[in-house]
Amino acid sequence: MIVLSLFDGISCGQIAFERLGITFDGVNNVYIASEIKKNAIKTTQLHYPNTIQVGDVCKLHYDSATNALYKDCVFKDNKYYLGEKVIDGKPDIIIGGSPCQNFSSLRATNGLAIDGLRGDKSKLFYEYLRLLKEIEPKYFLLENVKVKKQDKKMLDNYLDVEGILIDSKLLTYQTRARYYWTNIPNVTVPEDKHISFQDYKDTNIERCKESSPNRTPSRITMWANGNGGDNKTCKNITHADKVGCLSTKQDRAPNSGMIQYGDWCRYLTRREMEQAQTLPIGYCDHLSYRQACDVIGDGWTVDVIKHIFNFIPWEEMKCQK
């Protein structure tokens, strides 16, 4: 089985496959990752060294004439000039979460327009769509934020399936509503596991210290003695059951929430962020706190992806468990 993961990040998709008993040795089962962020690639290769990294999605091309996938291709004069061959044959499954900055409601919070599919970042969706049409895999999965109604309709039409809205809070303590477009049959919304942040709150002194920022005027405003600032964009989650949606930066407003720490506050620790995304504990211990925030916030909630993959008719797939 060949899986092509576009905008792979830290390989949350690969973790989900692993939890279903499917591992990638690079021979029988092959996992190809398109990613350009160095810390994300570093994390993936640390945990999954058999992953084939292919770089920029814009330079990937499946050539039907040779029945092979190529990287570092050049598109010129309305055709592709082939680069280095990655693998013979075509992927059985394509997965990915194209960058969502232009869809995100955070743009409106920061006074920016929600550009949808017209935005520079979200235009990478069309690269996903291009490869989907070139390869025509058996199954595909696309994840994105909760988009506007008109953008949702456009994406439904482009992908010829209706996106399913699943909130990560059903399977973890993080509120993270996302749309998932897939042709995997009969996917349903998972049942609520009623998981509370209070059962996972980190008490490790070093990790809590690491996530407690220095006092500055802007951070004092964000915390506002636990009142979350004037516009309540930084919620006090000290006693909350759920935390806000993880983003790539905790040190900003809005964020996932702030926690009372002594006479001051802290952000989520790296352990709390990992568990909010149902990542393996310690998955990002090799990174700095800020680097961990970046790649974890960019990632998927693994157990949501596992839930979706569980509906794949595995008896039809050429994979080894």
Stretch-by-stretch model annotation:
Residues 124, 128, 277, 289-293, ...:
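Catalytic phosphate/metal-binding cores of nucleic-acid and nucleotide-processing enzymes, i.e., regions
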Residues 9, 33-35, 56, 128, ...:
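Active-site beta-strand/loop signature of hydrolases that rely on acidic residues for catalysis
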Residues 260-286:
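FAD-binding beta-loop-beta segment adjacent to the flavin cofactor pocket
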